[in-house]
Amino acid sequence: MAKAVRMADIAQRLGISTVSVSKGLAGKEGVSAEMRAKILAVAEEMGYQPPARAHTQPGGESIGILVADRFFNENAFYSNLYRAVLKCAAEQDISVLMEIVLPQAEKSCNMPSFLVNRKVDGLIFMGEISRRYLATAVQTGVPFMLLDFYDDAIAADCVLSDNTSGSYMMTEHLISTGRRNIGFVGSVLSTSSIMDRYLGYVKALLRAGLPIRDDWRLEDRDDRGLFIPFTLPHEMPEAFVCNCDEVAYNLVETLKRNGYRVPQDVAVTDSMGRMHGDAQFAG
């Protein structure tokens, strides 16, 4: 039996991305009319057959959610995000299947059965996942979107917080209270969200003419995305902007164990505007 032609095969023939092929076949924006014509011509030449539309029940639709294991532990943010998606789906009479992607599955790009067998009409990636895994999933041709992250190398619809502006405003608020030495907590290269929050922090400091010191940027997680103990600098800043509330809480506990009062000695805030510690500081 001849092997089924995939979007990835068409993409390889034309030297373009699988996402572009998907858009061309679906008649979506993002590819030129000339390229769309080439995609359709090559698809016909190669005998491409679009997979049958998936339905879990007559008249119903389904979506799959993929989330990396490192994000779906005790992290209240992603638990709440998942519940919000479930609520919206239920209101639209859409069923939801979820797969927690374990580290080994992410590394080996092992796709869940509901995706391989096209048991879903669409896919949501919730929280950052490796580019290789994402690219492999895209090749299935199932429509997808990204939730709480983006990837510069993959054209996709995404839903995001305005991380840069939120962090900028929080850093600016700290500056307005008279603090001039401000650090940042977050492994900047770990996720697009942390990177954008760091950029907002840097922008605020640059505009105020304040120092940006490498020793005041604390790493909060390892290459696997797992939290690590903080290494406090020898010379402490007056405040820290943390990339999320969980990290802020962990930092407060670390500061207390090391004899610092929060916020009297060191103020701690997350990038979404929440202050942490025994008391709110005036601002």
What are these regions (language model features)?
Residues 168-210:
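An alpha-beta-alpha
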Residues 89-101, 198, 202-226:
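Short beta-strand elements in bilobed, periplasmic/extracellular small-molecule ligand-binding domains
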Residues 13, 23, 56-73, 173, ...:
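Short beta-strand segments enriched in small/hydrophobic residues
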Residues 1-2, 60-172, 230-239, 246:
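Alpha-helical recognition/docking segments in bacterial nutrient-uptake
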Residues 228-283:
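Flexible loop/turn connectors
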Residues 180-181, 212-216, 262-268:
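Short acidic capping loops at alpha-helix termini that bridge into adjacent secondary structure
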